[in-house]
Amino acid sequence: VAQYRQHRRTGSLPAARDLHGRGRRRQYAGHVCAGGGGCSAGRQPAADQRQPDGYLNQFYEREKGRTTAFPASLPADAQPFDLLVINICSLAWADMDAVNLQNHPLWSKMDIMFDNFNSATAYSGPAAIRLLRASCGQLSHRDLYQPVNQQCYLFDNLAKLGFKEQLMLDHSGVFGNFLKELREQGDMQAPLMSQAGIGNELTSFDGEPIYNDLELLTRWLDQQQKGGDGRTATFFNVIPLHDGNRFVGSNKSADYPPRAQKLFDQLNTFLDQLEKSGRKVVVVIVPEHGAALVGDKMQMSGLRDIPSPNITHTPVGIKLVGMKAPHQGSPLQIKTPSSYLALSELVSRLVDGKVFSEPSVDWQALTQGCRRPRSSPKTTTPS
């Protein structure tokens, strides 16, 4: 059981690695944000759909040339702000639909929603690595565990511009060597924020506590307030929705709907706290992968061996708090097929912080290239 749970969390078995590195790429190829030039899927050369390996190799070759260009330095009038990336385990659009939470108020508070974001994997470790390496194009699963150019690391790019890196988890990070992978493959070297004194109502299947996310976020906000107006970039991984979690005192796996409801409520409450704090914060909510609450023709519900669309089609939202001219109305929807490089591109456009003090913001220009996809070939998707 323990080996299977580790497989589910990390994708550590050879068969799963092959699926990450090959099968899903056939669906995903051609839909990655083009680096350095915007967030839309670029025009792709024709490929023989009867030769999937050739198409796949062609895709990886294109991806090698895609990067986000961060500035070498910030202008003198740059405005400091906090970047908070909330990485949620086990949440896809299909899961929200299954438990009727797609219209939770949390999502209507977003300024930008990626409606067609692809997590590119069905496991936590690879998803976190891909997010931390968001400033370069996609790699095969195997290459995630190989050295990569330093410019690929999103948080390193921010650190070079004066952002202090911070790390939060609502778990220990020990199981499946998750924290170790963040350090070694994601180059996240910031010390883990203390969890001392934080309550927990959930435990993971192996009995480890899963700490209260609202309490952790409130502690984070308190620390930012005490730290003044410096620039920070925080990676926060949360796992209350992971399968096998239990309420304290129970030996039964907790139902998904109440856990999702509580997580969304807590994030919603935290955004209200941020608004009242007066801090300038860019909040990015980006799930690792889905929970597979709904099965498909490829596999039954609860299984994530095949990274099908029900698992990799995840809700990604961005909220800018503390703006002089905040976004009005419904979230700006980005329907273009996109992934992590699109997030890196948007962060690079926000990095000087001037958007917070401008009397008006051209949201269309801010997301230019993320809203109108150029033509790309049809790809093979599981049906």
Task: Give the label of every model feature segment.
Residues 106, 154-157, 262, 266-274:
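Catalytic-core regions built around general acid/base machinery
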Residues 140-145, 204-206, 253-260, 271-272, ...:
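Active-site rim elements
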Residues 245-267:
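Active-site-proximal segments of metal-dependent phosphoesterases and phosphodiesterases across multiple
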Residues 267, 284-285:
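Pol beta-like nucleotidyltransferase catalytic core
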Residues 280, 286-324:
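Histidine-centered active-site microenvironments of extracellular/periplasmic hydrolases
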Residues 351, 355-383:
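Phosphate/adenylate-binding glycine loop and adjacent helical scaffold
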